[in-house]
Amino acid sequence: MFLRIALTAAMAATLATVSPAQAAFSRLEAERAAVADALALQVLSQEAEAQRAQARATRALPNPQLRLGLTNLPADTFAWDQEPMTQLQVSLRQALPNGRARAARFTAALEGARQTSEQRDLAALELRAALRERLIELAWRQEQGHLLGRQEAVLAQLESQALSAFKAGRGGESDVLEVRLARQARVQAQLQNDTAVASAEASLQRWLPEALLVQGAPASLTELFPTFTSWPTSAAVEDRLAAHPAARRLEAGWKMAGAQRDAAKADFGPDYAVDFAYGARDDLSPLGRRPDLLSAGITISLPLFGREKQAQGLAAAELREEGQRAALRDALRALKADYDSRRSAAKQQSDALTHYETTLFPLAERHWERSLARFAEGTLPFDRALAAALALLSTQSAALDLKRQRAQSESALLFLIGQELDHE
């Protein structure tokens, strides 16, 4: 007796220690692991950093130009100590491009880098949505397998009663055959479903690390989405919709176009250059000692003959800016409309699922139990009993499909909101 108690306690302690480690991973854990492990997202992040570095480089001034040479050299003798204006000259030229245009192009380059960064965030959302679809498919298939097993058990009960009725002379052999065919259809569907489950589990290797795959995926849609709570209106989440990476990417494109327009407008201004020159003359010249010469000046590049080209560039930049602004407004309207549509569908699916669970399920189960009992008593024909069984099975299948649709709506809303729900 003492040994049995000790073994029982040891087994309980072992199960208590092992079960948490074998618990299925949560949806959020899987999504975060997939995002952290995605090489494509790392490529986009590195590209955004590279573009920021290039943007910072646009602010740098061009390199100065150093010139060494002889000036005013006599062409007949090529002697630099005979003419008083001959000099060994060192000159330095520093170009100073249009500052406003340079600052605008720097801003445009930064917005281009932000576009790439937002593209990375959008790709992360799309990756999470694709992973959720796989997890929903897997959880639905697993629940479908359990449901097919329960449905086969229901048909097995009816088959047993039909066989008893046939042996008692109260039914035909066709009744037994019909229910066996229906039962075999469930068995065949179970085999196909098992194959689909294995395929769905294998597809997770594309996204998830081995540590999570060992734990196993959530076994049901309820585990995948613990709460199907109501979603707020689009007006309440307007800021979140506006912060969606798809909208922010278009916003960055709009601001980049605006900066390019500012650069095109600033190009009407002049460019500058500063020149310094020092000319050394020969102290040993027969003409006597001569002082060295120093020169300084400013060069202004006037955009006179390229104004038509610059005007066309400015007009094109303004059109691009207006187009990007229109694309942003359209994207925000589309996000709001899609959110309202998905939210309405999710509410309808939740209401329908509640109706199934509170009304249709109990009704179909009671009808089936009573029909089976009356068929066993011989007071109900076989076709009516089979109809009751099939009604129960179709109710169960319809409810499971509805749960799948509700999970898909939840996933779509998560994608649109761009972040996790407060209740999660």
What are these regions (language model features)?
Residues 106-110, 173-182, 315, 382-390:
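Short, charged, amphipathic alpha-helical segments
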Residues 41-55, 123, 127-148, 157, ...:
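Amphipathic alpha-helical coiled-coil segments
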Residues 123-243, 342-345, 349, 392, ...:
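Periplasmic alpha-helical coiled-coil/stalk elements that build and connect Gram-negative outer-membrane
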Residues 90, 296-298:
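Membrane-embedded beta-strands of outer-membrane beta-barrel proteins
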Residues 6-17:
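Bacterial N-terminal signal peptides
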